[in-house]
């Protein structure tokens, strides 16, 4: 299967050149002319993003920061901005490499190959090391603190993740609010702590349930507590 590369470039001629060159090298190329469209195309099937900085609307720096909230896909900046400050800003925003225009196709291909090689090694290592908790459509990574629902990653806070992991590790066991608070927060339970747990359960349901009003994953056992309900 060919590697999939997203080219984010508002200049039509440069975008065409990149697409033609990368396609000729055997890659599958997707195109976006701005950051907004790029964010719509970013998903788990991408292997590399080639990203301009000066674009209409969302800049390449902002686009990179948004991508980094949910994805570790390699990002190669390709831009006319060539100062040391520009390069530093791009790398600190989450970029993995930085090239300036004008560029040679030979160097571009070398950098693409290097990024894809590193990413492939990272993915293989991650698959070997990673163990999951699975329930229904949910898949929870215990090593990387990641939660997936089918093929979509769900962003949880650290406390929400720890609540979900606690419940999934003991299927069908009922955890009282006190059990959850003392296990997750690691602090003595007080009466007002019940509201804290309820608020976080509600937020967690809003992110993982198809219908939070009729939860499938986080079940309430009235007067007793909560349990993970999906098999």
UniProtKB/Swiss-Prot annotation:
Residues 4-116 form the Response regulatory domain. It holds the Pfam family Response_reg. Signal peptide: none annotated. It comes from the Bacteria. Residues 129-230 bind DNA. Member of the two-component regulatory system YrkQ/YrkP. This is Uncharacterized transcriptional regulatory protein YrkP. PANTHER family: REGULATOR OF RPOS, RESPONSE REGULATOR SAER. The modification 4-aspartylphosphate is found at residue 52. It is found in: Cytoplasm. Phosphorylated by YrkQ. GO terms for molecular function: phosphorelay response regulator activity; transcription cis-regulatory region binding. The keyword Cytoplasm applies. It comes from Bacillus subtilis (strain 168). Its main location: cytoplasm. GO terms for cellular component: cytosol; protein-DNA complex. SUPFAM superfamilies: C-terminal effector domain of the bipartite response regulators, CheY-like. The keyword Cell wall biogenesis/degradation does not apply. Keywords: Cytoplasm, DNA-binding, Phosphoprotein, Transcription, Transcription regulation, Two-component regulatory system. GO terms for biological process: regulation of DNA-templated transcription. InterPro entries: CheY-like_superfamily, OmpR/PhoB-type_DNA-bd, Sig_transdc_resp-reg_C-effctor, Sig_transdc_resp-reg_receiver, WalR-like, WH-like_DNA-bd_sf.
